[in-house]
Amino acid sequence: MEPIIRVDHLTHTYSAGTPFQRSAVKDMSLDIYRGEFLGIIGHTGSGKSTLIQHLNGLLKPTGGRIFLNGQDIWADPKKIRQVRFQVGLVFQYPEYQLFEETVYKDVSFGPRNMGLSEKEIDRRVRASVHAVGLNDDVLEKSPFALSGGQKRRVAIAGVMAMEPKVLILDEPTAGLDPRGCEDILALLRSYHAQRGSTVVLVSHSMEEIACNAQRIIVLSGGDVYLQGTPGEVFAHARQLETVGLDVPQVTKIAHALHEKGVPVDPAVYTVEALQKQLLALKGGRAVC
């Protein structure tokens, strides 16, 4: 499968040449494939935020290259703005970046900067607002009059409105209650299924990653530590613990059962999958 984004021996050093020099990413290489739902996870300081800021050209590599559709994004610095239209980045707590008088103006900011017609801008604004579960009633409201969860949705809609080929979200559920978290994740699943765009979810929550990502990349110390399907990654529970990460609670239970001789897959990562295996062992009969 051809990657839509390729990271080739990426290195990034902050404050290079000063006493405060720090390498955040060290010779990192990875691929992101067209149409996949990718999860990126890592402990604080693993290089997650630095990596994703390179993917749409917000940071320039100290060394190495970033390819988008086979083209080095920094081959012509004058075109880096076009890269940012194709690779949309939603920062953590994106609602803090809302600034316009109305929701309509805020969501239309990106498409307007793309030089689109008013008709196309209007189409994109309404489609994106609907995609995040809001209706036209909010369009003329001040974004600052909305609830916290609604503000987050509007901020995400503003990036979706550019219709990027790749949508990257940094901790999109941070600070939300469980219902709010699931609402955001559900809209991302729906967006991915309907648009066929590549979605990259950066999270500290193993449960979020396990239940949504088709593939996972684990970062540690500024480089790729593990990658694979959720089952492949969570099979390495002990290795994950050594880099300060945990596995989903259901995987912990499966590991404990497996160690006690119960023939279940220790890498199972959803409640439904573990329940199915346990019911099969009981001959399909549910037990209270």
Where is each model-derived feature located?
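A short, flexible loop at the N-terminus of ABC-type nucleotide-binding domains that lies
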Residues: M1-I4, T13-D27, P77-K79
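Helix-to-loop junction immediately C-terminal to a conserved catalytic motif
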Residues: N56
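ABC ATPase NBD Q-loop/coupling interface
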Residues: R65-Q82
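Conserved ABC ATPase "signature" region
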Residues: K119-D137
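Conserved ABC ATPase signature
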Residues: S142-L146, Q150
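Conserved catalytic motifs of ABC-family nucleotide-binding domains
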Residues: E163
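Catalytic Walker B motif of ABC-type/P-loop ATPase nucleotide-binding domains
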Residues: L167-D170
